């Protein structure tokens, strides 16, 4: 009888431990999901104020864009993306590193596409007057924490920009260039797409972005150009 009572006590204690562990895990995941860029870093004044300066045209575009939430910090998808960043970091080579450093500046990003001078001016205007203000506004809305704050194995190779992760600005802007140029030079589409994809992936290799940041940036680039319309196309319209 004593042995039976002892077994019951042991089983009860095990049950309590399991319950506490379960609650601890739930609490931990809840805390992880509460992490944002604003709670871990400071927004830049320019980046934060972009949303307050949207003109009417950009506001109309924004209203018609697909606003898709990013995966929760505790989600399986985010954990998979974090592991993917760690893997990409291990594969980082000297060529990638040089590209990552150079691509911090816009002139080095657009240069890769080999645009003509007049095309460059039109594309500059499109990116800085349309694309950038819109994606910065969406970044502010989502305020996604950077990957290195969810996985300490991720150490960014360059300074983290002063704004949230989602969507990737580099991806949005690079794919905007690729889509615009492909409309004018369809025979070079594969080349432009490869350049844009590498620029976006470099930000993941650098430890700055999740894959979902890059994917959403690509989607936004396509949708923004579609909403601008053929009449106002940066290279083919009166824009």
Can you describe what each PLM-predicted range is?
Residues 216-239:
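C-terminal domain-closing interface element
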Residues 25-209, 223, 227-230:
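Hydrophobic alpha-helical bundle signature of multipass membrane enzymes
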Residues 1-30:
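Intrinsically disordered, compositionally biased terminal peptides
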Residues 208-216:
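A structural-propensity feature for long, helix-poor, extended segments
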């Amino acid at each position: 009888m004593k042995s039976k009572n002892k077994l019951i006590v042991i089983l009860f204690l095990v049950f309590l431990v399991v319950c506490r562990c379960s609650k601890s895990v739930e609490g931990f995941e809840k805390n992880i999901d509460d992490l944002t860029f604003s709670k871990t870093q400071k927004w830049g004044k320019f980046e934060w104020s972009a949303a307050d300066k949207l003109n009417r045209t950009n506001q109309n575009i924004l209203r018609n864009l697909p606003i898709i939430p990013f995966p929760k910090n505790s989600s399986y998808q985010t954990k998979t993306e974090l592991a993917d960043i760690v893997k990409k970091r291990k594969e980082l080579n000297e060529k990638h590193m040089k590209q990552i450093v150079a691509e911090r500046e816009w002139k080095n990003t657009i240069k890769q596409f080999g645009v003509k001078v007049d095309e460059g001016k039109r594309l500059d205007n499109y990116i800085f007057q349309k694309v950038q203000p819109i994606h910065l506004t969406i970044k502010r809305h989502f305020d996604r924490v950077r990957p290195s704050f969810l996985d300490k194995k991720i150490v960014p190779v360059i300074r983290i920009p002063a704004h949230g992760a989602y969507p990737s600005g580099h991806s949005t802007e690079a794919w905007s260039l690729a889509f615009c140029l492909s409309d004018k030079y369809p025979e070079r589409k594969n080349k432009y797409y490869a350049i844009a994809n590498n620029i976006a992936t470099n930000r993941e290799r650098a430890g700055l972005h999740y894959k979902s940041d890059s994917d959403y940036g690509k989607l936004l680039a396509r949708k923004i150009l579609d909403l601008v319309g053929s009449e106002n196309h940066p290279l083919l319209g009166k824009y």
